Design a protein with these regions (language model features):
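Short Pro/Gly-enriched beta-strand edge/turn motifs at strand-loop
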Residues: 9-15, 118-122, 143-145
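Residues that act as N-cap/strand-start positions at coil-to-secondary-structure junctions
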Residues: 1-2, 23-25, 126-128, 134, ...
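Conserved beta-strand hairpin/beta-sheet module of binuclear metal-dependent hydrolase folds
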Residues: 3-55, 161-171
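Active-site HxH/HxHxD metal-binding segment of metal-dependent hydrolases
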Residues: 44-139
Length: 171
């Protein structure tokens, strides 16, 4: 398994996938239902999070995004189905608000043991068209597992939390 990521099992079908080796210490969450799995955020994009996800589930994956900041969308490039809040569609598809050089500086500002295949000169901020737009109150059904979208703007215009009432989990 890729040593860049740390996987912690929260319950039988919920996993935290973390990047503890970087100062940002980003966390993504994999929730497996009966029909599909949801990956909440994809981290920094320093290493391929898809390889880790594929060791945990064979279900189809929908990526849902808490917000469009570089440390939450870096691994979006490894997935086909991405959902974001409607207020951040343009940030994802065309107008990311932070220049690439600022992001690269933030990525490298503190020393860490990057994977050998990571090259900062090739690092890009993910840009793409989301396959689904999220709205406050939307329900995402994974098959015997359901998330409710809660729009929580402030950190960014389209910031969202995701609530799973049956387990009382808030992501």
């Amino acid at each position: 398994m890729d040593s860049w990521f740390t996987v912690e099992q929260i319950d039988c079908n919920t996993f935290a996938i973390s990047e503890y080796k970087h100062w940002e210490e980003t966390h993504s969450y994999l929730l497996c239902g009966e029909k599909m799995a949801v990956l909440i955020d994809t981290g920094l994009g320093i290493s391929n999070i898809r390889k880790i996800v594929d060791t945990l589930t064979q279900l189809p994956i929908m990526v849902i995004t808490t917000h469009i900041h570089w440390d939450h969308i870096g691994g979006h490039k490894y997935f086909k189905f991405i959902a974001v809040h409607e207020a951040e569609r343009e940030w994802l598809s065309a107008k990311f608000p932070i220049p690439l050089q600022v992001v690269k500086h933030s990525l490298m500002c503190k020393p860490c043991n990057f994977p050998l295949d990571f090259n900062i000169d090739q690092y890009q901020i993910f840009q793409g068209v989301p396959q689904m737009l999220l709205h406050d109150g939307d329900s995402i059904d994974l098959g015997k597992r359901k998330l409710i979208v809660i729009h929580t703007p402030g950190h960014s215009p389209g910031h969202c939390c995701f609530y799973e009432a049956d387990r009382k989990y808030l992501y």
